[in-house]
Every structure is written in structure tokens, then in C-alpha cells.
Amino acid sequence: MSDVKVYPVDPNVAANALINEEQYQEMYKRSIDDPAAFWAEQAEARIDWFKKWDNVLDFDLRKGHIKWFEGAKLNVSYNCIDRHLEKRGDKVAILWEGDNPAADRKITYRELSALVNKFANALKARGVKKGDRVCIYMPMIPEAAVAMLACTRIGAVHSIVFGGFSPDALRDRIIDAECRVVITADGGMRGSKKIPLRKNVETALAQCPNVHTCFVVQDTQLEIEWTEGRDVWYHEAIAAASADCPPEEMDAEDPLFVLYTSGSTGKPKGVLHTTGGYLLYASITHQYIFDYHEDDIYWCTADVGWVTGHTYIVYGPLANGATTLMFEGVPTYPDASRFWQVVDKHQVSIFYTAPTAIRSIMSQGDALVKATSRQSLRILGSVGEPINPEAWEWYYHVVGEGRCPIVDTWWQTETGGILITPLPGATPLKPGSATRPFFGVNPKVLSNEGKEMEGPCEGILVLDHPWPGMMRTVYGDHDRFINTYFANYPGYYFCGDGCRRDEDGYYWITGRVDDVINVSGHRLGTAEVESALVLHDQVAEAAVVGMPHEIKGQGIYAYVTLMSGVEPSDALKTELVKLVRKEIGPIASLDVIQFAPGLPKTRSGKIMRRILRKIAAHEVDTLGDTSTLADPSVVQNLIDNMPK
């Protein structure tokens, strides 16, 4: 790893940053040596409590037992809105950019307060009370954040289902979380297309007899069916409600939200996060990792249907009194310069997006980026999967013009917030590395036998101590929580990812542990092979899986998407085989390369490798659940064009 390029911290960035290297080392040491004292100090400084805690931390990882700030009382909406009103009442809280470039809205903290209070009262008027579950199935409009915060105001537990999910997936999540109220919109906009959200809800609710209320936001004027007595127009409910709703005092360990994430087997898991620890962790990670200052305009391009949207569009930024930008559209509409047009229009200073979006824009060339200014940008971020070094370099040099540190963040739905990440003023950067652990995070690397390894090594990434933002259970199934995260390696939280730790103590995420290929007894992380493939200037994206091999046990099967205008050829295949051998070694000889116009992805942009593994093994009759695919036709195309 010694030939890896290192980008030192810019002295100007360090001078103005909230955390420099010396402070990072001192705070990190304290957070590991005495976590209870460290987090108590942060909780005092960051959160307004109605009552302080009796005990900072009580845990037993073997039993999946984790409690932070027991006995403390707080309210999330109070911390995200009320406490800012005196000093920041007229500051923009939510800056909304519509799918249509001409559409935008600005909502101040004072205006947000009135909307949240009114909708909280509207929920109460329909019988919603503390502890009730409420399903939110919304487009990326401000009302989605209002609905989340209104639930927290009265102690209801929200369960957001991403607006791209099918009626069946929505039904399953409504039933599993036992929701009796649904909040939706008549439709949503995505790349100039109208998405029939309410129609999907109607289909789902036909099989959800326990849902007694459905609030509908009028957004796209799509015609919808109406069920009298059950359905309520959002705008009418708001108009009739009082703007005064006292915040419910919640225990720190009361549930805040349930968010479903796909399991490697069986039905989706309802990840349950609680109130005090989660909000504290959202606040501290948002402030320090993005080096957030009071005058920043902050934009995370995620959807609130994913955990990134929960923590880094809504709760983290608003807890810190920030202006958070919500974007309804897609990166390629009206064209692939849209992100940078929005950055210039709103003078965005902190920008957080996913590698899949970066690669998609990158494949369209540099001209559309360079046609924009982007001078307001000072911090760039990456989230969702490991970013390959080539995309990192392009993001750094072309988008950020070498001025903006990239925070390549590793975390999960289950962790509530970022765990491994650079800090802009403290961490020298290595393209493709998530670098170092955040405060209170103590990663360990285990061998296949479950033994801790020291120094530079490669193995299974685990954590041996809880942090405040971690999930507390799988909703309604604590045994599944224990079996998934704690049973494999007792005493550790098992995250399912592999990693490499280098000589500087930097962590490189090598992909899911089930995405490890074992070639003739040698372990290869799929992310490493993919990173090698996309070094080729004609490759837009690559996904690599293991395939059955008579001699080697597993061979390497690569699915490769090419840059626009590039034609597949045998000569190109030969170049790619040589490139991977050169980058990783002869052990990484590709057995099959399948060129494809697209890869099967979920609606959040994650590649569905399970399906790719099935195709590579010619097990196309047992693909399993494909309901979360953004474009099912991609799979059929791959099957039809499998190399003979």
C-alpha cells in the first residue's frame, strides 16, 4: 500500500476547521479511554434535556443489550426547532429544490415550527399517541420532513418507506411495523415523470385493514381514489389545527423510528433507533465530519427514505441549526450538470452524495461540470458504498478542483451515523479509504477464526464497544437482532463488512463479507477487483462476483458497463484482464467478463450482487426477491446475453 497517493491536510482548511489533528488525537483517546465521560460531556453540550440521565451507559453486547442516558427526558422536535427560534427563527431551515429547476421553496425555522406543531395536532386529532407507529411514503418534499418532526413532537414512531418501493413492499412494512396511520402524497416527481405514490398506497392498503387514517399531501394534482372517513387532505388538516403543540417528554431510550433494511435472508429487518443517543450522534457527526459552520449551506443528495436522509438531511443538520437542502430531482435531469447547477444557484458549501451518482455523472465527461462555477463548495462527501479511487480522484480534481477535502464515510442503517471517516481539518486523505474511526468508535479486525489481529491486516470488521447512535433491536424480533449482529462473534458488533487496515491505521472497506471471492484459497474483496476495472478510461462501472470453478473453487465473474459511445470488443476484454492482473496480481485473473448496458440496482443505487451471483452461477430460476430493483429489465438483459 506504500504507493498509494496521500493528500495532506490543507493548512488553510486545518486553520479554520473545528477539529485539527492534535484535537482529533486528544478527543479520540478520551472517547475510547472513558466513553461514558466523553459522551456525557457531549450530551450536556449538544442536547437540551428536560431531565438529565441517571446512568450514561449500560450494555452487554452478547445479549444485544444497549442503553444510553437511561432516565433522561428530551424531545427531538424541540431540539431540532424550538431551541433555535430565539436566535435563528428567521434562518432558512429547509431549502427545497424541486425536480423542475424553476421550483424551489424556503422554510425558516419559525415557519417550520408552525407547520410541525399544526401537523402534530392533526395527527393527535386522528387518535395518534405516544408509541404509535406511523408510516410515511412521500416524495422528497418539505412535507416529508414536517411529517417526521410532527411524529417526534408527540412521541409517535415513524417508519419511512422509500417512495420507489412497490405496493407489496409497502404493505409488508406497514404490517410488520403495525402502522395504523399512513402519510403520503397524491404523487411525486422524478426526472419530469409523475410517480403515482397514492395509487401504490391504495393498492397496499387494500391488504392493511388496521390502517384507519391516510393523510394525503396535494403535490402533483394526480387524480386519486378517495375513501371517506379514512382519507384526509394534509392542507385541510393543517388549516384546521392549532400552531401550539407542547412537545412530548420522551425517555432517551424510547423508540424514535423504525427503518427497514434488506437482510441477507428472509424478510426486511425493521431497524429500531431510539431518541437520545441517536440525536446526540446525528448532531456530533454532522458537525465535526462536515466541519459545519453557522453560515454553511449544506446539501445531502439522499432521499429521506434511507438512513442517510434521516440522519444527514433532517435530524443532524436541524439539531445543529443548519440550513439543509432537500432535492426532489435526479442528478441527470434536465442534464448531468444538475447537481452543479443547484450548487451554484443556492451557493452550497458542503455537498454529500453517493459514488453511484458520481460515476454516473463522470461517464458523461467533464464539460458539463466545468460549465458551472462550484466556487461555493468547500467540503465534499461520499456515502453508500466504498468509492473507487478513480471516481474519488475525479470528484476531487474535477468537481472540487483540488480545493475541497472529501469525507469518504463508512456507516450503515444499523449504526445510525457515520463510524469511519476523515475529518476535513485533521485527516490526510487516501483515495478509496474511509481512513480513521470517529470518536467513540473502536474498530477491530478479526481473522476467519474470530481472533483480533494487530497492525496492517485484512479480515472481518467488528466493533467492540457501543456508540450512542447504534440500533437497539430489530422491531418485533430481538432474537433476529442478536443472531444477525452479535452471535457470530460474541462480544462484538458484526457489521457484515470486510476491511483492510494499512500501516497508517487507515481502514479500507473491501465489501460485504459475503462479497469475498475465494480463489484457490486466496481471499479477494470484490471492491478491490472493481476498483481495478474502473481504472480503465472506457469503463463506467463494474460489479464483480464469485462463480463456481472446477479447479479454483471460485472464479471471478465481472459485469462491466462502458462509457457512452464505447463498443464492447475482445480487445477491450484482454486489456481489462491485463489491467486487473497488473493492479492486484495473477491471482485476480478474470474468468468471465460480461459487458452490460446497466447493472441491477436498488432504488437507492446499491448494486444487487445477490442477483449477479445467481446469474454467474447460471441459477437464473432462483433469483429470489427482486421487488427492490429500480429497473427489472436490466436483469433480463443480463440473462439474455450471458456469455456461452
From Swiss-Prot:
It is an enzyme of class 6 (ligase). Catalyzes the conversion of acetate into acetyl-CoA (AcCoA), an essential intermediate at the junction of anabolic and catabolic pathways. AcsA undergoes a two-step reaction. In the first half reaction, AcsA combines acetate with ATP to form acetyl-adenylate (AcAMP) intermediate. In the second half reaction, it can then transfer the acetyl group from AcAMP to the sulfhydryl group of CoA, forming the product AcCoA. This is Acetyl-coenzyme A synthetase. ATP binds at residues 384-386, 408-413, 497, 512, 523. GO terms for biological process: acetyl-CoA biosynthetic process from acetate. It comes from the Bacteria. Its cofactor is Mg(2+). Its EC number is 6.2.1.1. It holds the Pfam family AMP-binding. Mg(2+) binds at residues 534, 536, 539. Belongs to the ATP-dependent AMP-binding enzyme family. It comes from Magnetococcus marinus (strain ATCC BAA-1437 / JCM 17883 / MC-1). The lineage of its organism: Bacteria, Pseudomonadati, Pseudomonadota, Alphaproteobacteria, Magnetococcales. The modification N6-acetyllysine is found at residue 606. Keywords: Acetylation, ATP-binding, Ligase, Magnesium, Metal-binding, Nucleotide-binding.
